[in-house]
Amino acid sequence: MEYTEVMVRYGELSTKGKNRKDFINRLATNVERVLKDFPQIEFHPRHDRMHIILNGAPFTEVDKRLKKVFGIQTYSPAIKIPKTLEDIEKTSLELMKETFKPGMTFKINTKRSDHKFEYDTNQLNNLVGDFLFDNIDNLKAEMKHPDLVLRIEVRQDAVYISNQLLHGVGGMPVGTAGKAVMMLSGGIDSPVASWLALKRGVDIEMVHFFSPPYTTEKALAKAKELTGILANYAGKINFIAVPFAEIQETIKEKLPEGYLMTVQRRFMLQLADRIRAMRGGLAIFNGESVGQVASQTLESMVAINDVTTTPVIRPVATMDKTEIIAKAEEIGTFDLSIQPFEDCCTIFAPPRPKTKPKLDKAREYEARLDVEGLIQRALDGIEVMPIYPNQKFLDDKAQEDADLL
């Protein structure tokens, strides 16, 4: 049967008290944005749920997009019918036959906001249930843990019937928790951290460091394409490319090998913080996981974080690598993340970086450099571009070459 509307139930919005209206409006805006390709759709956000009137739009396509909107707890496609027992019984039977398999159990859940309707909820449950038993063989009722739930809502204007309860991704609507920058590499961890930041309602902008000619255009395209995958969950994400080659060359030329990584990361964090301030962000996110590599030990974090008082949030800090990989596969970033295009974090990596760098040493070595000049020249060269869902930047040839490596 062709569904006529979708009933969307909110996630954590119920806990937000007086800010609830703002959160609902933001969610409605985000839903409208992901469904903008269907101009016939109407949106009606209300206190307890949102009604999406399909007006002929295919639910299968709408479903694919709603699954990626943060702030949705559950949703149900429904059919609007006239308020007669005959129509209710007929539609209920058609929906049940679409999903019922022998041995399945069911229950009917009726709600009635129109108390002038001729049948109350118990009467309607019994009448429709008896009709289904008469027309479907081997049908069994189960009140506690049924396989199928037929939901009937009697409203003032019509009756709405649904046979599915679909789960959204939960979380908070993107944009309700403020704005931040995300330090995005081309690896596995930072895209997962980005997804987790979006899930908490943070409006993130990607900061990506690239170092031509040491890194290729393919490496930059890979980072942009990762952003395109994540934009499925946000509608649009700004991508900020930061030239980093001069800083890396200077550090390699003038500082001891053991502190190359530490000082390099200090520069990255300072640049991310400057960009955050320029863009009106409140925090910095990254994909660091405690102890995973030399620059992510607690001692390294102390030596690197020293350059800012801005909150640095690490969503995957306590996750095992296997957990991060599983999430990357789930959200669709893993296959692209493992494509072997070198990023700026690997090209100048020393063979024996300090795992327990000293803060005073890091400060001392950094002070030998023209810190402000290097940072300003990098900022002068940044490029900002909006990236939209599934936007492509790697051509097929680049993908084929990467698969062969």
Curated annotation (Swiss-Prot):
GO molecular function: ATP binding; CCA tRNA nucleotidyltransferase activity; tRNA binding; tRNA-uracil-4 sulfurtransferase activity
SUPFAM superfamilies named in the record: Adenine nucleotide alpha hydrolases-like (SSF52402), THUMP domain-like (SSF143437)
Residues the record lists as binding ATP: 183-184, 208-209, 265, 287, 296
Reaction equation(s) it catalyzes: [ThiI sulfur-carrier protein]-S-sulfanyl-L-cysteine + a uridine in tRNA + 2 reduced [2Fe-2S]-[ferredoxin] + ATP + H(+) = [ThiI sulfur-carrier protein]-L-cysteine + a 4-thiouridine in tRNA + 2 oxidized [2Fe-2S]-[ferredoxin] + AMP + diphosphate; [ThiS sulfur-carrier protein]-C-terminal Gly-Gly-AMP + S-sulfanyl-L-cysteinyl-[cysteine desulfurase] + AH2 = [ThiS sulfur-carrier protein]-C-terminal-Gly-aminoethanethioate + L-cysteinyl-[cysteine desulfurase] + A + AMP + 2 H(+)
Major location (coarse): cytoplasm
Primary enzyme class: transferase
Pathway membership, UniProt: Cofactor biosynthesis; thiamine diphosphate biosynthesis
Residue span(s) of domain THUMP: 60-165
General function of this protein: Catalyzes the ATP-dependent transfer of a sulfur to tRNA to produce 4-thiouridine in position 8 of tRNAs, which functions as a near-UV photosensor. Also catalyzes the transfer of sulfur to the sulfur carrier protein ThiS, forming ThiS-thiocarboxylate. This is a step in the synthesis of thiazole, in the thiamine biosynthesis pathway. The sulfur is donated as persulfide by IscS.
Protein name: Probable tRNA sulfurtransferase
Organism: Lactobacillus acidophilus (strain ATCC 700396 / NCK56 / N2 / NCFM)
